[in-house]
A protein has these predicted regions:
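Short hydrophobic beta-strand that contains or immediately precedes a catalytic carboxylate
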Residues: 129-133
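Conserved, well-ordered alpha-helix/loop/beta-strand core segments that scaffold catalytic motifs
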Residues: 296, 326-332, 349-360, 367-376, ...
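Alpha-helical scaffolding within the catalytic cores
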Residues: 107-118, 307-321, 353-358, 391
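Catalytic His-Asp segment of secreted/periplasmic serine-dependent ester chemistry enzymes
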Residues: 26-29, 374-459
Length: 459
């Protein structure tokens, strides 16, 4: 090709490109919604700002979590949507939610109705509450207090779901594994994978983690274990159970049978469960056939952005089969060291909308309750104080919850707001790390949660 032809071809390309930019809005329907950059951005290498409220900027932000667990957090920075929830009505999946201001922030009205309706059935069927959270709920903290109140009020027995391998002792049951009648450590038991935490503990190509976000794999190296359960401390309703369910793949045998659920011979407080075969175990539930069952599912180091990485069918089937009427999400604390600007706070809050929507699709008959982080302490210029953005984080999580038709409880405000963690430390309710509660503090937080929830139920 001759040089003048090459030059002519290049000029034609620029003319065509300029024409596309000029008529960008007119041609967008024919381009499948593609947005053309401004012509100046093409030459300068910069993308012009887009005013469309539906546009999203997605970044992968490396995040060092408070629990010393590294992961990458997908953050969608959408200032317009984050601020838009100040309005009084929102349309979510063709449903309008009326919003009111409360002592715990903006709240959508009627969003606990499905849970409250479910409680009316607790006398004749099982009603389930699934409590997900970060390390603040480890050891069954907060959950156990809420469970006790709910079971005392509406009936129900048992601690609910337990992982096959328990590495973090709980305040409710003593649990360990036996192989050939010998007690073994978690390292000596089946291989485990987690949807949260370090990458080397996650599965390479499968999203089968079950309802708890973790799976124990029985294989030729470990194909038979006995799970031992006995009560811990003072007996409560959570230590009695009359029904067993094992959530596992079909080839797993429970006490030599392929039947994975059924009534026990009596109401028990201790049990040995023989589990064998080649397959996967997602959880073991000790429960009753009626009343309220409350599951404690801590995800150490988690920010709450993992549910969309889990298997949709497994979650959907579990929530439907167990009549799950309330899903509690208690997250946000682990992102505070990173969320040191308002933009980052809004980005994290917006990212949680995707998780809420996903869980609502999986559990259409359940209410969703988001619990924000507690007050948390850091050191600024040598002085111990609350994280500077903790109040803003609480506000933004309340707003996105209202926008998504999700209930919100502010643990931060229930504690007393900014600086309250120091007060709780002085009262012996919180640890010296300025993040976690002692058991007494977790009991108090659980009581405050129940008092708030009971008012909602009675209203």
């Amino acid at each position: 090709m001759r040089p003048r032809h090459i030059v002519l071809f290049i000029v034609c390309c620029f003319v065509l490109l300029g024409a596309i930019v000029v008529v960008g809005d007119w041609c967008r329907p024919m381009l499948g919604g593609v947005r053309c950059p401004h012509i100046l951005a093409v030459f300068s290498g910069q993308q012009s700002a887009v005013s469309d409220q539906q546009s999203e900027e997605q970044t992968m932000v490396p995040l060092e979590l408070a629990d010393s667990t590294s992961l990458e957090l997908e953050v969608r920075s959408e200032t317009a949507d984050a601020d838009r929830v100040q309005n009084t009505e929102y349309r979510v999946q063709n449903t309008e939610y009326r919003v009111q201001n409360t002592e715990y922030g903006v709240q959508a009205v009627g969003v606990l109705d499905k849970f409250i309706e479910g409680l009316q059935e607790a006398g004749s069927k099982q009603v389930r509450v699934v409590h997900y959270g970060d390390s603040q709920i480890e050891e069954d903290r907060i959950t156990s207090t809420l469970r006790t109140y709910l079971q005392n009020e509406y009936g129900g027995l048992g601690p609910g779901l337990l992982p096959l391998v328990q590495t973090i002792p709980t305040r409710t049951v003593v649990q360990y594994l036996l192989i050939d009648r010998q007690r073994v450590t978690a390292r000596e038991g089946p291989k485990r994978y987690f949807v949260y935490g370090p990458k080397n503990q996650q599965r390479d190509s499968s999203n089968h983690y079950g309802i708890m976000g973790q799976v124990a794999v029985l294989d030729s190296l470990c194909d038979s274990v006995t799970m031992h359960i006995e009560p811990y401390g003072k007996l409560t309703s959570a230590n009695y159970f009359s029904q067993l369910r094992v959530w596992a793949t079909r080839d797993i045998l429970v006490d030599g049978s392929r039947r994975h659920q059924g009534a026990l011979r009596d109401t028990l407080t201790r049990l040995n469960i023989d589990i064998s075969g080649i397959g996967e175990v997602y959880g073991v539930s000790l429960e009753s056939a009626t009343g309220v069952i409350v599951d404690n599912i801590p995800m150490r180091g988690g920010s709450g952005n993992v549910f969309t990485k889990m298997n949709r069918k497994e979650l959907t089937d579990f929530y439907a089969e167990t009549n799950t009427r309330l899903i509690i999400l208690q997250f946000g604390g682990n992102v505070m060291p990173w969320a040191n600007t308002e933009e980052r706070v809004r980005g994290y809050a917006y990212s949680m909308r995707k998780q809420i929507r996903f869980l609502r699709e999986c559990a259409p008959n359940a209410s969703i309750l988001f619990i924000g982080p507690s007050d948390m302490l850091t050191v600024v210029d040598g002085e111990k104080m609350s994280y500077p953005t903790i109040a803003y984080m609480d506000q933004q999580l309340a707003r996105i919850s209202a926008a998504e038709g999700t209930a919100y409880w502010s643990l931060f405000k229930a504690m007393g707001g900014e600086g309250s963690m120091q007060v709780w430390q002085e009262k012996g309710l919180a640890s010296s790390d300025g993040v976690h509660f002692y058991r007494s503090g977790a009991n108090r937080a659980g009581e405050l949660l129940w008092q708030w929830l009971k008012r909602k139920i009675d209203d």
